[in-house]
């Protein structure tokens, strides 16, 4: 499970890590956000639907790399996690990444005069508010989640190269799975 603030690089790192480990990749956004709306990421499935959709994917995948934020439903999935990764990055970098990602995905819709301009502006403010506790997802909430986990947790910097972070996750995974012996002890 890779968790952290928007724009930290969870999805990119999750995809790369899953590829390296030969595991399924589950992007939480795919299971929680409705796609039948005029404006993307404005309506979620009901809590029950989110749990059922993700539970089905987890059951089908067996072993997997999951990435995203699942604050309101994580308790249903925590027992599946053997390793959790808390990925962070500086707020300015995260805001820049999110802006670039949304601009690439939605083009002029997020620019001044576009039908998503206001939503985009509010989302960027939300991303910037993660550490301050003013965002919809907060550092405090994620830390409480991490503190409740019984699996191994590693902390990574989303500003670091993807390959080095993927390697760190792979090494931690192999240790958790008993495939690598610790040296020097």
List each language-model region with its residue ranges.
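Hydrophobic anchor at the beta1->P-loop junction of P-loop NTPases
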Residues: 2
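A glycine- and Lys/Arg-enriched "phosphate-lid" helix/loop adjacent to the NTP-binding pocket
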Residues: 83-84, 88-137
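Glycine-rich phosphate-binding loop used to anchor ATP phosphates in small-molecule kinases
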Residues: 46-92
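Conserved substrate/cofactor phosphate-moiety recognition/catalytic segment
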Residues: 15, 19-59
């Amino acid at each position: 499970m890779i968790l952290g603030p928007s724009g930290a690089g969870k999805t990119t790192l999750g995809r790369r890590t899953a590829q390296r480990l030969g595991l399924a990749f589950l992007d939480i956004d795919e299971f929680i956000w409705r796609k039948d709306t005029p404006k993307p990421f404005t309506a979620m499935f009901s809590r029950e639907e989110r749990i059922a959709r993700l539970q089905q994917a987890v059951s089908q995948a067996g072993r997997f790399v999951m990435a995203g934020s699942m604050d309101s439903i994580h308790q249903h999935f925590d027992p599946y996690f053997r390793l959790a990764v808390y990925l962070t990055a500086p707020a300015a970098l995260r805001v820049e990444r999110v802006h670039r990602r949304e601009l690439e995905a939605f083009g002029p819709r997020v620019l001044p005069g576009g039908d998503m301009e206001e939503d985009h502006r509010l989302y960027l403010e939300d991303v910037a508010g993660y550490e301050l506790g003013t965002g919809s997802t907060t550092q405090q909430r994620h830390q409480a989640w991490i503190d409740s986990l019984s699996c191994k947790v590693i902390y990574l910097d989303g500003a670091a190269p993807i390959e080095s972070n993927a390697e760190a996750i792979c090494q931690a995974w192999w240790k958790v799975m008993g495939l690598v012996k610790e040296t020097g002890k």
